[in-house]
Amino acid sequence: ILASGSEGNCLLVSAGGTHLLVDAGISARRICGALQAIGLSPADISGVLLTHEHTDHICGVATLTKQHRLPLYASRGTAEALCRKSSCVSDVLRVIPRAGVFNIGNAQITVFPTSHDAAESIDFRVDHDGASIGILTDTGVVTPEAEQALQGVGLLVLESNHDEEWLLSGPYPYYLKQRILGARGHLSNAAAGAFARRLAEGGTRQFVLAH
């Protein structure tokens, strides 16, 4: 995890020599520095998978993909929203279905819809040679598609965003509390824990809490 939280999100997934970024919500300079720290460069990246168009997920995406000619994969709704934000990267943009399976290099990528207040949010599962990692962040609920796609995943990066009682009694304005708590907001600690238990019963053994 190169960055996680409301100030920026970026995740590196490596699968048999294929390196992918999920989101680019920090500056391109920070991403390049983080890659350099682990012995990689943008030239080693096979593509950027975009979950949705909120700023904390796209802050560095235009600069990174344009400067280094990296393919950018996004759902149609996210792609259109990205262009409306004047971060249009149409020359490197590749539209993918909101649900389905495709391959980039050695990585098999499963796409599934999430429930977030964005144009057409998605998340991913990446499989290679019997190993798998799933990503489920920025969703108000665990969608049926996410539940199905993530069964048996080896490691899950899982949103665990808030304690509901603490959030309600905290300093955030009412409208923001309602947004976070809503079905198209963010996953609560309790909901994340319940989903993690279900996956653990199916064999998932590693969880990384995020956002």
Question: Predicted segment positions?
Answer:
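Conserved beta-strand hairpin/beta-sheet module of binuclear metal-dependent hydrolase folds
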Residues: I1-I38, I122-D138, L155
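Structured catalytic core of nucleotide-sugar glycosyltransferases
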Residues: L2-C10, T51-V61, K66, C83, ...
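A short helix->loop->beta-strand "cap" motif at the edges of active sites that frequently abuts
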Residues: T18, H68-P71, E201-Q206
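Active-site neighborhood of phospho(di)ester-bond hydrolases with catalytic His/Asp-centered motifs
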Residues: V22-G25, I45-E53, Y73-R76, G134-T137, ...
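Active-site metal-binding motif and surrounding structural segment of the metallo-beta-lactamase
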Residues: S27-A74
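Metallo-beta-lactamase
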Residues: R76-A131
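Conserved catalytic scaffold of divalent metal-dependent phosphoesterases
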Residues: G100, N106-V111, S115-H116, D129-I133, ...
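Cap/insert and terminal regions of metallo-dependent hydrolase folds
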Residues: P144-A210
